[in-house]
């Protein structure tokens, strides 16, 4: 089975920014990485308009089935008081559970300078393909139909018809 990927985009209200980042780094990421099947977790600052989800998190999974495991569901359904406070205050929250389709079982590039999340059809433009290493994911929940996560090596033009989210290490 292919690896899975969980993508989240979150944004706290401005007055909670410091607390939100402390919670994410000190509690949330270690908690998720302690769940069997979570392979890696990285946070990114997204280059988006206010209210669209300032922070992108990428969680690589052994498989998409990790998100239905008893260990994951226990954490998801029993959040800590700090998790309830921080997530409950978010002005933006988006979540995608995906199956990695390309290149299958490859892991994340540990030195990616940035990532680009493209929602929609996979771009065919030559300059995009030359600028990035792409991994494509199918969303089993049906929306968006395809998500492509690019690890950027060079500036990337915005292909027509796609919603693009650029993100940089936090």
Describe these PLM feature segments.
Residues 1-170:
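Macromolecular interaction modules
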């Amino acid at each position: 089975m292919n690896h899975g990927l969980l993508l989240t985009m979150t944004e706290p209200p401005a007055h909670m920014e410091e607390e939100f980042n402390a919670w994410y780094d000190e509690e949330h990421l270690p908690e998720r990485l302690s769940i069997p099947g979570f392979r890696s977790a990285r946070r990114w600052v997204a280059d988006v308009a206010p209210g669209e989800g300032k922070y992108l998190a990428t969680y690589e999974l052994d498989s998409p089935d990790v998100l239905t495991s008893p260990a994951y569901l226990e954490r998801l359904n029993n959040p800590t008081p700090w998790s309830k406070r921080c997530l409950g205050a978010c002005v933006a929250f988006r979540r995608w559970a995906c199956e990695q389709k390309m290149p299958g079982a490859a892991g994340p590039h540990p030195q990616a300078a940035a990532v680009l999340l493209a929602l929609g059809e996979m771009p065919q433009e030559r300059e995009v393909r030359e600028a990035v290493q792409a991994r494509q994911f199918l969303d089993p929940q049906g929306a968006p139909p395809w998500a492509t996560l690019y690890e950027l090596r060079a500036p990337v033009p915005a292909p027509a018809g796609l919603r693009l989210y650029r993100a940089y290490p936090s």
